Amino acid sequence: MLLQKLLWPRVGICTEDRLYYRMKAPSFRDEGDILRIEQGERVCFDTYFNSVSADKWRRYTAAQNFSLRLKLSGKLRVVLCSRHFINSQSVRAVLAEKVVQADSVQEFCFDFPKGADGMLFFELQALSGNAAYCGGAYECDAAEKDVQPVKIGVDICTFRREPFVMGNIARMRSDILENAASPLHNHLEVFVSDNGQTLDYDKLNSDTVHVVPNANVGGAGGFTRGMIEILKANENGAGVTHVLVMDDDIVLDTDVLLRTYTLLSLRKPEYADVFVGGAMLRLDRPNIQVENGAAWNQGQLISHKANFDLTKVDLCVANELEERHEYNAWWYCCIPIAVVRPDNLPMPIFIRGDDIEYGLRNCKRLVTLNGICVWHEPFESKYSSSMYYYILRNQCIDNSMHCPGYDANALKVDLRSQVMGEVNRYRYKNADLLIRGVRDFLKGIDWLEQTDAEALHKEIMAYGYKAQPVDQLDVPFDYSRYLYATKEEEKNKGKLKNLKVKLTRNGWLVPPTRENTVVSMMHMTAYNAYRVQKVLNYDSNSQKGFVTERSKEEYSRCVREMKACMKEIDTQFDAAAQSYRERCGEVRSLDFWKKYLNLDK
């Protein structure tokens, strides 16, 4: 049975060769995926996409007796290997080797020893000058009775991200939906909720792609609409067994869907409720992993295996070490349909935290696997003041239901830390949004149920900082100062700096000594604003920015509002948290969502 295809770098997907194979000499690929190998040269496939995590396949699935099928020409030594993580590094072991020869491209099969574990892979060494590798696959044995029926319903929520969405749909059409040779053919349908209402429905809709207009009610509302459409399709016999929630601004290799499908098809009965999570890799640096599963930690998020360079073999092996997962973000998360019930839909919290809450509520076991991933725009490309309203508000909502130890005092600590962090950056509007988010949480679940989320979001967006072309701002952009500011925090670490900051409240108790500075919009630290009058917050991607200014009046106003909010927390937190804990079912039912999304009209 096919386990994993051996993948190639692809223009438009990922061109980082070392995620697929490693060789010292420059690689020469002909059209049609043929890798020419110079005599004496060795190619290793102990890589993120082209190795097999045997331990996970054995633990979670019925897969047994792994084998390798390769298309080769010329004379080559084929070496079957494994790697294990021992004492903080991976250790290579040779399991078997064989010399093969063919005058033209020929298919060869190789069996890994029974019981082979760890990360399985192979190496090729060219023994002639005309050697070539032309692809292949890993296979396994599995009894027919152990293969379960699986059909995946892809749930995409989009808001004006046409290039990404259209590209991913086109790839799914050509590789799967309209490709009868694909194992996933007839086992995949795509459901798109168009929150921006800008897609061409007549052009996109078909028997297997379903695009519907939706109100702009954030990711929570968009993904929930997709779930509702999938439940409706199942009533008409669609037979979807798993809902794959997937962001609209990702790049997807469709083989990831096939690996997910195979994993689910072979899963053991005791893992019927397993979630499959895809890792997030950076779109701008495609070998760098942002997250591979995560823990909530009462809002102090822990992104597992963050910043792993997956071209490093030791990190590929370490990436498969299992940790305690509480959720997987919804850039790629596959959920059993048994979980997606009419009485168990997401919370209507618009954005930031809907995936976390749903995972905390439902994810008993999350499986991640090397090679199951998407490439996503880095978060530093997405600065928005509006997030300051949602992040802390939704943290409070999520903790009310899932972390009873998070009390009024814990919230006051978080509020003070975040508000003063923004005030010390002169970002007073962000501080206001943090406070407003907490005050809205304190109104309890009735407020959430009755609020027009789309109108509220427009108001929040209008209030925050808006980036403008820098030539329209009164602080000129200076690249040398921008570069200095990105390193300023590192240069000024130490006891003297810390004492200076504390004694002067980050410079508020002493006069400014610099007229202005230029900082990174996303990565600015409070120390960047130390004794500066004006700050240009600059985004290098858009080459836009906004200016904030030191103001003791604004400082005092924000501190007063924060202290007033803390008093409100003392008197209102317990009742608000209790309302979410006891009545959350009211806002995650199908009846509620139909009304919320105006689907009853």
Which residues are covered by each model-predicted region?
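Donor nucleotide-sugar recognition loop
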Residues: 330-332, 337, 342-360, 365-374, ...
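Acidic donor-binding segment of Leloir-type glycosyltransferases
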Residues: 172-212
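Terminal low-complexity segments of carbohydrate-biosynthetic enzymes
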Residues: 1-119, 393-394, 398-601
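Conserved donor NDP-sugar-binding/catalytic core segment of glycosyltransferases
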Residues: 255-303
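Cell-envelope/extracellular polymer assembly enzymes that use nucleotide-activated donors
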Residues: 150-155, 189, 357
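Active-site donor/metal-binding and catalytic loop motifs
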Residues: 134-144, 369-385
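Short beta-strand-to-loop acidic/aromatic patch adjacent to the donor-nucleotide binding site
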Residues: 237-251
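A recurrent flexible, glycine/aromatic-enriched loop bordering the glycosyltransferase active site
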Residues: 306-333
